[in-house]
Amino acid sequence: MIGERPRGIRAVLTSGALLLVALLWLGPYAWMTLTSLKTLPEIVAAPAYPLPQSVQLGAYREVLKAVPVLRYLANTIVMAVAIAALQIALALPAGYALAKLHFAGKRAAFTLVLACLLIPAQVTFVPIFTMLGAAGLVNTFGALILPFAVSAFGTFLVRQALLNVPDELIEAARMDGASELRIIYGLLAPMLRPTLASFFLFSFIFHYNDYFWPLVMTTDDRVRTLPLAIALLREQGTGVRWHVVMAGNVILSLPVLALFAAAQRQILRAVTARAI
């Protein structure tokens, strides 16, 4: 009993510290949401009050009127999902080759993958833009998706996960007549579901929030993305209407929150599997 009391106190302190960190992370999002429900005079008033005097949804109506939000949102989701799906589809065979196959230059190939992680995207911007322009892909979804179809990080992640898979399992599948592609997508992919779900979420959020590349490659509303719409909200009028900007950011964040809520179980499985 004496030894259980310090352990219980430690658990309470740990939970309290984690709760404090969670509140610090949620604080900015809560402030953004509350600001979107205020009027502009309430926002600029001094001293500022965190809660609105009365809930106002006018900022959300202004967002929907000012920019084609639904079209931009659909474009953003299509782009982010397509990129994440392509990256997973290509990272699986690449990671499998680096983890389970034996060929000359395997170590050099893995070193090259690691080196690609160190290359800033800005370095490759000009040559990729030139190639896409020459191919006539500007203002198309191809220009937004194809440059990111291959992920060095995804390849590294899959390779590391496959190192924990017994070689005997793969040999047994080969003896049963399974092809390499059947082994990769039919046997190994379901086993790596937590890892792939974590990577899908990471890739989706990264490209969903991407501002620079869609800004450069698109000028047509048919393919523009939602982060560009948020920037347009800042530029309208003589001053920044912060309640409208915050409302746009709340709309922008909703699909990501929904995706995280749907995938959190797989993410926890991936984290616990790494811990074990």
What kind of feature is each model-predicted range?
Residues 1-3:
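N-terminal hydrophobic targeting signals that begin at the initiator methionine
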Residues 7-276:
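A structural signal for multi-pass alpha-helical bundles of membrane permease subunits
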